[in-house]
């Protein structure tokens, strides 16, 4: 009997913790809606640290094998190009392999080689439109060679400490933000939007306005992400 009572008490305690966590999430979401935040925006709990540089940080979590990310990229680039100077957009590769492609090693290696911006969209197109098996090293090497990238230098760069460090930081950031799907976009460590529907950019603009109005940065952190190019106003 004592053993059964202990089991029941443990079960009730676990249930109470789950109910409390669910209730806290509901409180955060309800409070956010009351402040005029888009219904599609999910509060990040707990809020994540951002750079302490006075700019609003937008993170795009993506995967090269994700067709929705591929479709979003041109629209996102156009949105980034018209952003004011108080906003910075950074890309963070997803942890999971989409279409067998691990985006992080490719992304950070090409960034270190100085050819990322030239090949970023081409990687999406190769994976999703041309069905190139970028997750297969020999196939990736052949594709890189066609783009003017030396496969041997690519492999050497990927093994470098700086690239491996950025890959590790990106993986941690994925865990901190609990990324399970792409595209996912985080705004200033406080709100998350998923998918690339037509309402995405109006929702992002609304969140930027909200962050400017509240102006409550979380803390200083060293990001793993890479800034997307933007035109300054």
PLM segments and residue spans:
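C-terminal cap of thioredoxin/glutaredoxin-like
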Residues: 2-5, 63, 146-233
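Solvent-exposed loop/turn segments at secondary-structure junctions
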Residues: 64-68, 95-99, 125-130, 160-163, ...
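Loop/turn elements at helix/coil->beta-strand transitions in domains of secreted/extracellular proteins
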Residues: 54-57, 85-88, 113-120, 150-152, ...
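Sec/Tat-exported extracytoplasmic proteins
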Residues: 65, 76, 80-83, 110-114, ...
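Structural microenvironment flanking redox-active thiols in thiol-disulfide oxidoreductases
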Residues: 83-113, 117-145
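Extracytoplasmic thiol/disulfide redox context detector
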Residues: 2-98, 171, 213-233
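Stable alpha-helical elements in mature extracytoplasmic
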Residues: 54, 68, 72-75, 102-103, ...
């Amino acid at each position: 009997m004592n053993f059964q009572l202990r089991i029941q008490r443990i079960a009730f305690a676990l249930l109470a913790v789950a109910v409390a966590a669910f209730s806290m999430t509901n409180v955060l979401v309800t409070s956010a809606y009351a402040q005029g935040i888009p219904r599609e925006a999910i509060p990040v709990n707990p809020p994540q640290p951002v750079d302490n540089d006075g700019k609003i940080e937008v993170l795009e979590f993506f995967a090269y094998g994700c067709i929705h990310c591929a479709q979003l990229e041109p629209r996102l680039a156009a949105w980034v190009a018209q952003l004011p100077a108080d906003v910075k957009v950074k890309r963070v590769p997803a942890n999971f392999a989409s279409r067998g492609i691990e985006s992080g090693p490719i992304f950070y290696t090409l960034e270190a080689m100085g050819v990322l911006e030239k090949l970023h969209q081409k990687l999406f197109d190769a994976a999703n439109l041309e069905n190139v098996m970028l997750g297969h090293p020999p196939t990736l090497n052949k594709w890189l060679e066609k783009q003017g990238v030396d496969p041997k230098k690519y492999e050497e760069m990927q093994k470098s400490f700086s690239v491996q460090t950025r890959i590790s930081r990106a993986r941690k950031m994925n865990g901190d933000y609990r990324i399970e799907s792409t595209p996912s976009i985080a705004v200033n460590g406080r709100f998350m939007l998923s998918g690339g529907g037509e309402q995405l950019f109006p929702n992002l603009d609304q969140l930027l306005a909200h962050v400017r109005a509240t102006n409550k940065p979380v803390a200083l952190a060293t990001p793993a992400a890479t800034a997307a190019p933007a035109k300054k106003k």
